Amino acid sequence: MAKGGDSYSPGDSTKGAKLFETRCKQCHTVENGGGHKVGPNLHGLFGRKTGQAEGYAYTDANKQADVTWDENSLFKYLENPKKFIPGTKMAFGGLKKTKERNDLITYLKESTA
């Protein structure tokens, strides 16, 4: 039986924006037409498959993962990226707190559309 907190539920986008600033922005951009940094630009993330941001050099693991990004796949990925996609080059250790993942995903839904 699934526990509450095992999947995405809408969070606070303002808190998610702060998390993005402190935990993600050094490697990612969200703006339409924004460049890639260490990690890919995240604009258009929702509905896109792993390893598909044009012009970004992904690992084979990311290209072959066959995951379509949505709220629940991101929820699982952001808990522990290297466990979700073994071989990813994303160095981020993850967000263990359910609320933080929900807040960040809510922000990403708004900022990457």
Swiss-Prot record:
Indicate whether Metal-binding appears among the record's keywords: yes
Q: Where in the cell is it found?
A: Mitochondrion intermembrane space
Which residues does the record list as N6,N6,N6-trimethyllysine (modified residue)? K82
PROSITE patterns membership: CYTC
User: Could you tell me what induces this protein?
Assistant: By oxygen and heat shock.
Query: What positions does the entry give for heme c binding?
Result: C24, C27, H28, M90
Can you cite a GO biological process for this protein? Answer: mitochondrial electron transport, ubiquinol to cytochrome c
Q: Which residues form a coiled coil?
A: none
Q: Name one GO molecular function term.
A: electron transfer activity
What Gene Ontology cellular-component terms does the record carry? mitochondrial intermembrane space
Database matches in InterPro entries: Cyt_c-like_dom (IPR009056), Cyt_c-like_dom_sf (IPR036909), Cyt_c_1A/1B (IPR002327)
What kind of modification does the protein receive after translation?
Answer: Binds 1 heme c group covalently per subunit.
Query: What keywords sit in the KW lines?
Result: Electron transport, Heme, Iron, Metal-binding, Methylation, Mitochondrion, Respiratory chain, Stress response, Transport
What family does the entry list? Belongs to the cytochrome c family.
- So what does this one do? Electron carrier protein. The oxidized form of the cytochrome c heme group can accept an electron from the heme group of the cytochrome c1 subunit of cytochrome reductase. Cytochrome c then transfers this electron to the cytochrome oxidase complex, the final protein carrier in the mitochondrial electron-transport chain.
Entry protein name: Cytochrome c
Q: Which gene encodes it?
A: cycA
